[in-house]
């Protein structure tokens, strides 16, 4: 590493003008203070804030926390909002009816269960959910996960399959509610956006291929892996039938065109929402008029609202635990992501944990009325927002539309072609193929692109569960790697200033002979302390190679650690710091520390590091440390040890806002900045 080095002694001697160096006193917290907050650990601090917040809550605060709908009910503007909410609810309802039946088929269930899953959860979420635009109901990704998990346990034609799907909704709801109540939503932050994008892209491809059987007219293997599906499609090619293929492709083209037109022109956004219903109507008319024998129909659908019943088959709950946890994670990522974006767009605050609780309660109540797992939908939420929905009332209107469909329209659904439902699914998941995101990652961050590629590839070829586990594993590995290998910079002084910056970023910065300044840009703990020590040794060697300013400057005398970015230091790091100091001491190198924060300084003081290194070697600014170190580098060798500046004594001036000059027995002079180039 090439470093620019400046000989301060030469600059000092050549300067005819000099100014006295002034050191800012370092304020040291009293380690024996009776202030209880001085010794609080992060968990206790969080717990105390949480309990204090609970104590401050009034009756109405509790009502708003449990029932977020009261936040918008109290301030509802009927003349401004009602018409918008009504139209948005009708629009989403028209879109949801065909999508719900399509996603139920994707989940391996009868279409009626898609409508059941769109009824009660919608009403419950409108009361307990915190997002005012999120459209809750069946979604493609969760439906695929349900199918993939249950098909390995029981055949979809058996009644047990449906019972397990309903039980899965209860388990997912419990998971979500617990996470929301315990405020554990932050755990999802460890899953990279690259993993989410790669997973959804691969899942969209698998979903699309799984629906081709309704286009081709023959059975295709049910699998979450791409190769068995492709092999099955090729093996059954001799059974191909033209009528369902032509009808399915026609409906798919209509859906894609209507979606594109609705997105491109805001005034025609209703066309996008009407696409699925248009496709169903066209398919139903053709099937009713021409009766093509090769086109399979949905068949009879029960009429009426879902009845209350408690989920069954609890003896299979243990088998469903991994899948329910996976569905919970995917549902959270899909719902909370779009809910936050919509809240920011509509300028209101959204609590992720409250959102989790609302989704959980919706799934729990839904499972009591024959629903399978539901979550927020990207496409329907976007349509809801574009339709200018203002509050959760739009969700209530959507629920009424679904209820009317269950009561009056189900006899008409028996003539819907299966290929029409498949076309709706393929049209919906086409938007999940995030090729633009992959291009962006390739252009911006090759590591994230690698993570995207790994996740999508493993999901395609090894299945959804393996793909998610590997993707999350690599995501956590990257986080751990970054934490264990933190960024460390060698600092240099910018000419004409007292500012010290990374020399790689600012090549014009210079250092002083015999001194190396290192900034650690991360907390220091057991996982990264060895790496930090190794890097410090490397920097020391690199500095030595470029130092040749006379016999007294042929090596490093001082190492200054700039610790302002260090927010935390643990016991392992403290012990390693002691070892580093002892190692430096045997080689005649003095360690100095600049600007540690309060908690770090308290930890160092309690561990005896401050006394070990010397109180006089702790500074507020890097520049203070540099000037004192330069003085020792340049002073005559016979100067008494008693002449060391006692910065710790100066720090005893509590709350002092004035600069304190170095003691009179130390004559420190600094060349004027104009000459330091």
UniProtKB/Swiss-Prot annotation:
The chain crosses the membrane at residues 84-104, 109-129, 134-154, 162-182, 190-210, 242-262, 270-290, 319-339, 356-376, 393-413, 421-441, 460-480. Residues 1-83, 130-133, 183-189, 263-269, 340-355, 414-420, 481-677 are cytoplasmic. PROSITE patterns: SLC26A, STAS. Keywords: Membrane, Sulfate transport, Symport, Transmembrane, Transmembrane helix, Transport. Belongs to the SLC26A/SulP transporter (TC 2.A.53) family. This is Probable sulfate transporter 4.2. It comes from Arabidopsis thaliana (Mouse-ear cress). Residues 105-108, 155-161, 211-241, 291-318, 377-392, 442-459 are extracellular. Gene3D superfamilies: STAS domain. CDD domains: STAS_SulP_like_sulfate_transporter. H(+)/sulfate cotransporter that may play a role in the regulation of sulfate assimilation. One of its GO terms (molecular function) is symporter activity. Pfam families: STAS (PF01740), Sulfate_transp (PF00916). It is a multi-pass membrane protein. GO terms for cellular component: membrane. The keyword Membrane applies. Residues 505-629 form the STAS domain. It is found in: Membrane.
């Amino acid at each position: 590493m090439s470093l620019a080095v400046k000989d301060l002694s030469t600059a000092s001697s050549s300067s005819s003008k000099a100014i006295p160096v002034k050191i800012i006193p370092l304020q040291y917290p009293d380690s024996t203070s009776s202030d209880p907050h001085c010794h609080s650990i992060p968990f206790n601090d969080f717990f105390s804030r949480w309990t204090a917040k609970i104590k401050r809550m009034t009756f109405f605060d509790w009502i708003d926390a449990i029932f977020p709908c009261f936040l918008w009910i109290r301030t509802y503007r009927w003349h401004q909002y009602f018409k918008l909410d009504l139209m948005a609810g009708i629009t989403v309802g028209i879109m949801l009816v065909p999508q719900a039946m399509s996603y139920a088929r994707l989940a391996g269930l009868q279409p009626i269960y898609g409508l059941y899953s769109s009824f009660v959860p919608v009403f419950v979420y409108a009361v307990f959910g915190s997002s005012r635009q999120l459209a809750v109901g069946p979604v493609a990704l969760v439906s695929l996960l349900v199918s993939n998990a249950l098909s390995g346990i029981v055949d979809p034609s058996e009644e047990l399959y449906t019972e397990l799907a309903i039980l899965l909704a209860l388990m997912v709801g419990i998971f979500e509610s617990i996470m929301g109540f315990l405020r554990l939503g932050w755990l999802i932050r460890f899953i990279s956006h690259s993993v989410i994008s790669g997973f959804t892209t691969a899942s969209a491809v698998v979903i699309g291929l799984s629906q081709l059987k309704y286009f081709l007219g023959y059975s295709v293997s049910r699998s979450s892996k791409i190769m068995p599906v492709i092999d099955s499609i090729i093996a059954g090619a001799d059974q191909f039938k033209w009528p369902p293929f032509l009808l399915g492709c026609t409906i798919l083209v209509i859906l894609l065109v209507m979606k594109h037109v609705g997105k491109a022109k805001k005034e025609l956004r209703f066309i996008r929402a009407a696409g699925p219903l248009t496709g169903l109507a066209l398919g139903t008319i053709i099937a009713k008029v021409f009766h093509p024998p090769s086109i399979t129909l949905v068949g009879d659908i029960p009429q009426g609202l879902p009845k209350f019943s408690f989920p069954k088959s609890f003896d299979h709950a243990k088998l469903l635990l991994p899948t329910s946890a996976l569905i919970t994670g995917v549902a959270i990522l899909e719902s909370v992501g779009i809910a936050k974006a919509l809240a920011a767009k509509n300028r209101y605050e959204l609590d992720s944990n409250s959102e989790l609780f609302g989704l959980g309660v919706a799934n729990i109540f839904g499972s009591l009325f024959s629903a399978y797992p539901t979550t927020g939908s990207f496409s329907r939420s976007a349509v809801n927002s574009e339709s200018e929905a203002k509050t959760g009332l739009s969700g209530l209107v959507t629920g009424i539309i679904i209820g009317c469909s269950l009561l009056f329209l189900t006899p008409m659904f028996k003539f819907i072609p299966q290929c029409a439902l498949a076309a709706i699914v393929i049209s919906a998941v086409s938007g999940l193929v995030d090729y633009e995101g992959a291009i962006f990652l390739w252009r911006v961050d090759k590591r994230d692109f690698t993570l995207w590629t790994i996740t999508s590839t493993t999901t395609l070829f090894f299945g959804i569960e393996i793909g998610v586990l590997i993707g999350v594993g690599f995501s956590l590995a990257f986080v751990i790697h970054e934490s264990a290998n933190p960024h460390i910079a060698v600092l240099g002084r910018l000419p004409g200033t007292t500012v010290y910056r990374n020399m790689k970023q600012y090549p014009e910065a210079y250092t002083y002979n015999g001194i190396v300044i290192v900034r650690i840009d991360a907390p220091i703990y057991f996982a990264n302390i060895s790496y930090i020590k190794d890097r410090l040794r490397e920097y020391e060697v690199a500095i030595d190679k470029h130092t040749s300013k006379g016999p007294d400057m042929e090596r490093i005398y001082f190492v200054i650690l700039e610790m302002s970015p260090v927010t935390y230091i643990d016991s392992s790091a403290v012990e390693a710091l002691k070892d580093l100091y002892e190692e430096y001491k045997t080689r005649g190198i003095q360690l100095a520390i600049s600007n540690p924060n309060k908690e770090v300084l308290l930890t160092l003081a309690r561990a005896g590091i401050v006394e070990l290194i010397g109180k006089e070697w702790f500074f507020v600014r890097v520049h203070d440390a540099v000037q004192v170190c330069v003085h020792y580098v340049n002073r005559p060798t016979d100067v008494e040890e008693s002449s060391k500046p006692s910065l710790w004594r100066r720090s005893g001036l509590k709350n002092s806002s004035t600069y304190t000059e170095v003691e009179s027995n130390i004559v420190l002079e600094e060349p004027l900045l104009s000459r330091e180039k």
